[in-house]
Design a protein with these regions (language model features):
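Nucleotide donor/acceptor-binding cores
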Residues: 1-3
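Active-site and donor-binding regions of nucleotide-sugar-utilizing enzymes
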Residues: 5-145
Length: 146
């Protein structure tokens, strides 16, 4: 059984990470949450909450899923950034551009070809992370037939 940490530090992270939590538990693996400076909006249906760094280290996740561009680098497991928005180019060339590489992630999960291409180019340039086009966890379920 693999273990996955769902790292949330913005309120919108709940909607992005819950579909991943569902997929993790449906395949028989274990998930847990860590909330950083946001209100606890977890429900009974959600995986357990780890409230300390020590608890995260004891949980020892294989991977940490993160919808934002920051995660503590001392958390165990590979760091996976999960994309959730469109790149509309509004911050191109700035420190906050869509494809900014901060050196924190081992894998970038992109939602579509445009973003994937940008990150594949950066992966080739920097050489310390991989890119996988995985879809959009928040919207993909809405597009599935019932």
């Amino acid at each position: 059984m693999k273990r996955f940490l769902l790292f949330a530090n913005q309120l919108y992270c709940y909607q992005i990470l819950r579909p991943l939590q569902k997929a993790i538990t449906e395949r028989g693996d274990e998930a847990a949450w860590f909330l950083h400076k946001i209100p606890n909006l977890l429900t009974e249906q959600d995986a357990p909450l780890l409230s300390t760094v020590e608890a995260v280290k004891e949980f020892n996740p294989d991977a940490v899923f993160v919808p934002t561009n920051w995660v503590p680098d001392f958390f165990p497991g590979i760091k996976v950034q999960v994309f959730h928005g469109f790149d509309v180019g509004k911050r191109a060339g700035t420190r906050q551009e869509h494809a900014r590489i901060r050196g924190l992630f081992d894998l970038y999960c992109t939602q579509g070809p445009q973003t994937t291409r940008q990150f594949e180019e950066k992966a080739e340039k920097y050489g310390h992370f991989r890119v996988a086009e995985t879809g959009w966890s928040m919207l993909d379920p809405l597009l599935q037939p019932e």
